[in-house]
From Swiss-Prot:
Gene Ontology CC terms, in alphabetical order: nucleus
Name of the protein described by the UniProt record: Pyriculol/pyriculariol biosynthesis cluster transcription factor 1
Cross-referenced PANTHER family: UNCHARACTERIZED TRANSCRIPTIONAL REGULATORY PROTEIN, ZN(II)2CYS6 TRANSCRIPTION FACTOR (EUROFUNG)
Task performed by this protein: Transcriptional regulator; part of the gene cluster that mediates the biosynthesis of pyriculol and pyriculariol, two heptaketides that induce lesion formation upon application on rice leaves but are dispensable for pathogenicity. With TRF2, negatively regulates the expression of the gene cluster and the subsequent pyriculol and pyriculariol production.
Cited CDD domains: fungal_TF_MHR, GAL4
InterPro entries: Sec_Metabolite_Reg, Transcription_factor_dom_fun, Zn2-C6_fun-type_DNA-bd_sf, Zn2Cys6_DnaBD
Length: 742
């Protein structure tokens, strides 16, 4: 083909003189073409020379009218809110005054059209906004982003922001957290251990918190054992479950199952949780699974973390939940029934954690949003919930695996909605009602009415949904409810004549509480929920008890207190580790100081020589003497002792001052501070071997995927160190992990 012919051909296509291009072969070989056809290169190669044709001209993009209209609408909204940079006070005042329904007392006014708020989905995350203006702007911005993304030839990588490490997380997790880029597979348990930890969680932890949907989550454990890559939020959730399972195990059990101790397991799995959450960027990437993992993690920190820091961390959880709209019921937001129910479970667990951590931190006010309407979870088994369900979830008649959570939710809601009720537990006696600031008779009567209402609602719940024959969880729940109401009512009863001050009353309550704790420990040593009982231990109240003993040398109540201290310490040997914390050092010094004063008082005033308990001998050897210098032996100190604590005969003293043997070395370290809002030890009198339920084994319920009322029956206790027993329990889930353990 000649050059002229090529030019003519090109000209007929474009309609104007085109730029002469290199031939196809020269372009392909990336060599210089002389742009004559045939070119010299093609002639030498003896091949056909084909001229290139220019690419079709790109159509000129017209201005996007829709985009411009949306921008103009955003500008109008902003001008309406703040023209010339100043808000239109008159217009805002008019809008507020036009609201037909006034909000409840103490709540901020919300526009009628924005009563329920709105969820904003963006970049794989969800945020809640209750501002009409902002929700409208977010809608417009999202629509504009969709337009721009649709026009772009290269779509943006949606996962890039999701995988960006969250640098702010160091504010919560410290500098020892593994780097986000690290391989979390190194922290994963082995395939066989994964199934064992999952079963421990189902048996011991899940019945008490009910945050996850077992049938939906279980396939991920199968994938984890196969080494398949998991979504980052699922990975974080699994690590949080491993952590809670390790918390529920004793050191001996952990060593038998995993091959390493409990503390090593907690450090390993906690590091996995933190690394996964940081890799997700949990402070800016919000989804239900990530929040479940974070809540599980905070539960595992109870007792292992400073109580004030725990309250601060729980504030982060509340803000994330609020940003996701968890505080608004899913029915108001148009969410599917399954998601609505799971959000309810999560919110009430957060609510329980908030009031407990607030009270443990010494705060009476809550960080909860002033406007929340999330309904309480329904009485349904996990098998009754289906992710694809379209009908609203309804309560199931009869016993289910939710019974314990339903009771704790009622109690938590009562405490949160009854601020100011705590003082009446201390200011009920006739002698102290005149103290400035004491509640009036009318206020006490009002609170007693509220407590009667709580008692009635709890009784209705247990009568309707609780059946002792349905297993130990239901027995546990019945006694839990009875203990709460009994302790509250006892606190409201008039005190005896020996109670002189509210401090005396607190001392009496502390002694009775820890006496009940000892009984519950002794009767529940082989129960799957014993770990949970131990986590109820109130360190601060125990230190208060020791402080009172350092000022009260003798008396019937003092004798009971010393006996209780000696019975408590075998279950909490971590308290004897003086170098572990300043709190432990303070406790040890108070105990040594109190025993020294008691010895001297009984020797000089009563002629009795006491046998020194082994724990006192140990503490004397490790506590610096500067911490135990005391003036309690002086007459002025003894004169300050309440009369009730000095009135004791030689015979009574010799009977009451007996010392038991050495501490039982079989108990491992379980740390306190978990659940204790309305009462210092709400589980303190639970006896799961109560003769009211003869023949019922003391064990936890293993949740079943297809559980019915008849399925939730007592079975033999699971020994999690025995693979055969654990393998049998997996039959109900359709899994045979035996081969994975070999």
């Amino acid at each position: 083909m000649s050059s002229a012919a090529a030019s003519a051909t090109a000209g007929s296509v474009t309609g104007k003189t085109p730029r002469i291009l290199a031939c196809v072969l020269c372009q392909h070989r990336k060599i210089k073409c002389d742009r004559s056809f045939p070119c010299a290169n093609c002639q030498r190669a003896n091949v056909q020379c084909t001229p290139s044709t220019p690419a079709p001209a790109r159509k000129r993009r017209r201005p996007n009218q829709d985009l411009q209209e949306r921008l103009a609408r955003c500008e109008e909204l902003l001008k309406e809110y703040a023209p010339d940079g100043k808000p239109d006070i008159a217009r805002l005042t008019t809008k507020r005054s036009s609201l037909s329904q006034s909000p409840p007392k103490g709540e901020e006014p919300l526009p009628e059209w924005n009563r329920h708020g709105k969820l904003i989905h963006e970049d794989g995350s969800v945020r809640f906004v209750d501002s009409y203006m902002l929700s409208t702007i977010y809608d417009e911005l999202r629509a504009m982003r969709d337009i721009i993304d649709h026009d772009e030839s290269t779509p943006e990588d949606e996962s890039s922001d999701y995988m960006t490490p969250d640098t702010n997380a160091d504010l919560l997790f410290g500098g020892d957290t593994p780097q986000p880029a690290g391989n979390s597979m190194e922290l994963q348990p082995s395939p066989g251990h994964i199934f064992r930890l999952w079963q421990v969680f189902l048996d011991r932890v899940n019945p008490l918190i009910k945050l996850v949907h077992v049938p939906s989550l279980q396939p991920y454990f199968v994938e984890a054992t196969a080494g398949a890559p998991l979504p980052k939020n699922i990975e974080a959730l699994l690590f949080s479950i491993y952590t809670l399972a390790a918390v529920s195990l004793s050191d001996a059990e952990c060593t038998s199952i995993l091959g390493y101790g409990r503390e090593a397991a907690l450090h390993r799995f906690s590091s996995g949780v933190r690394a996964s959450l940081i890799r997700i960027g949990f402070l800016k990437t919000h989804d239900l699974t990530t929040l479940q993992a974070l809540v599980h993690y905070l539960i595992s920190l109870q007792g292992r973390y400073n109580r004030h820091a725990a309250w601060v961390l729980n504030g982060v959880v509340i803000r994330i939940a609020q940003k996701m709209g968890i505080h608004r019921d899913g029915t108001m937001l148009g969410l599917p029934p399954f998601e609505t129910e799971m959000r309810r479970r999560l919110w009430f667990q957060i609510l329980s954690m908030e009031f407990k951590t607030a009270l443990m931190s010494g705060l009476g006010h809550s960080l909860l949003p002033r406007v929340w309407d999330t309904q309480e979870p329904k009485n349904v088994n996990d098998a009754d919930l289906h992710p694809s369900a379209t009908e609203p979830v309804k309560d199931r008649e009869g016993p289910t695996e939710m019974i314990f959570v339903l009771i704790t939710n009622k109690v938590a809601r009562f405490i949160v909605e009854s601020p100011g009720i705590e003082p009446i537990f201390l200011y009920h006696d006739e002698k102290v009602k005149k103290i400035p600031g004491a509640p009036s008779e009318e206020k006490i009567k009002e609170f007693r009415g509220l407590i009667d209402g709580l008692s009635k609602s709890l009784l209705e719940l247990t009568d309707k949904y609780c059946d002792p024959a349905a297993g130990p969880l239901h027995q546990y729940t019945i006694e839990f409810q009875d203990i709460i109401m009994q302790r509250i009512r006892e606190s409201l009863e008039p005190g005896d004549a020996t109670i002189e001050t509210h401090i005396d009353h607190m001392f009496k309550m502390a002694v009775e509480s820890f006496e009940s704790t000892v009984v519950s420990y002794r009767n529940s040593c082989k129960v799957a929920y014993l770990w949970f009982l131990r986590l109820q231990f109130h360190n601060d109240l125990f230190t208060f008890l020791a402080g009172q003993l350092s000022q009260r040398p003798s008396g019937p109540l003092v004798d009971r207190a010393w006996e209780t201290v000696e019975n408590i310490l075998p279950y909490h040997p971590e308290l004897l580790k003086v170098n572990a914390s300043k709190e432990n050092l303070l406790l040890a010094s108070l105990l040594v100081k109190g025993w020294n004063m008691r010895e001297e008082y009984c020797s000089t005033q009563m002629g009795i020589t006491l046998n020194t308990p082994p724990y006192i001998e140990h503490l004397r050897s490790v506590v610096p003497q500067d911490y135990v210098k005391s003036e309690n032996s002086s007459p002025s100190a003894l004169s300050r002792i309440p009369k009730a604590n000095r009135m004791v005969t030689r015979e009574a003293a010799s009977d009451q001052l007996s010392v038991s043997g050495p501490m039982d070395p079989t108990f491992d370290e379980f740390i306190g501070n978990y659940l204790d809002g309305a009462d210092w030890d709400v589980f303190s009198r639970i006896n799961l071997e109560n003769p009211a339920f003869p023949g019922v084994p003391a064990t936890g319920i293993t949740p079943q995927v297809n559980a019915t009322a008849s399925d939730i029956l007592p079975s033999t206790r699971i020994d999690h160190t025995d693979p055969n027993q654990t393998s049998h329990q997996f039959a109900m889930y359709g899994i045979d992990p035996q081969s994975a353990w070999q």
